[in-house]
Structure formats: C-alpha cells, structure tokens
Amino acid sequence: LGTGSNSCYYDGSKIVNNVVSLGYFFGDEGSGAHMGKNFIKDYLLENLPEKLQEKFKKDYNYTRDNILDAVYNLPFPNRFLASFCEFYADNLSDKYIFDLITDSFREFFLNQVEKYKKIREVPLRFTGSVAFYFEPLLHQVSNEFNLKISRIMRSPFSALAEYHKTNKTI
C-alpha cells in the first residue's frame, strides 16, 4: 500500500494467486491515490468539514484548475493524488481524515484480501509508505476482518537486501 495498491497470495516459495489490480482510476483501494481521489473530490465539491477545507486551501493553495490540470493533463496523476498523505497524517485527529483512511483500507480488504480463500490461515504482510505510516489504522481494520498482520515494511528494498545478505548473494 503506497501510491497504488496490489496484493497476492504467497505460499512461502512462490506467488500462487493474485487478485487483479484495476489501477488508480478503478481500484487501488487502500492506496494514497485512492484516498487522494476521494479527498480531492470532496475538496472540489466543498464537502470537507469547513475547518479542514480551509486548512487544506491554506496549506496547498490549489485552485480547481490546478487540480484538474494535474489529474487530466500532467504525467502521473496517481502520484499527484497520492501526494496528500502527509496532510492526512498531520490531521489524523480529524474524523473525516480518520474515516477517509479506514474506509479506504476496508475497501482494500473487501476487494483484494478477502478474495483469497485461505487468507485467514496465514499472516498478512504489507509493504509501502501508506501501510507503514498508517500502521495503527491498518491493524485496526485488519482486526475488523479477523486477519492478522505479521509485518509492515516501508519499502521492499530493505527486505530484499536482508534476504541477499542472509543468503550471501550480495
């Protein structure tokens, strides 16, 4: 869970199942892009709580045209949409932000994780900045689904380096 999202079922030696990811436009539930899409839509429609609407406007100073240009005309709109995670972290005590994140995680569990038949037989592992920085909320939502998380890493590269060091391939 980072800019985007994906999942797979790994049996300890290979990936045996992979739920299709529909990308930032139709899917990426639980990701920064998914949260950003929902947040920015509410911002543009002025559906955010008033205090949060004003704080975001003050912090980012984006106009409607700036946002629409970034999403429809500039490269990597998913990265733009995911770029507001720091704002969410800074405003986590706001109920809207808390619900934005936990609802996005719930959608990830429903549309991705719950699709694996034997998912409750294995611990879950997550990689990505969104999973890492919102770890307590991810644990909370996984508990709602009676699922156990065993590891959350900010980046897969540290685990790859650890693997190669242990197996002396570096």
Model-flagged regions — what are they?
Residues I40-I170:
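ATP-binding/phosphotransfer module of carbohydrate and carboxylate kinases, centering on a glycine-rich
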Residues L1-E54:
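Phosphate-binding/catalytic loop of phosphoryl-transfer enzymes
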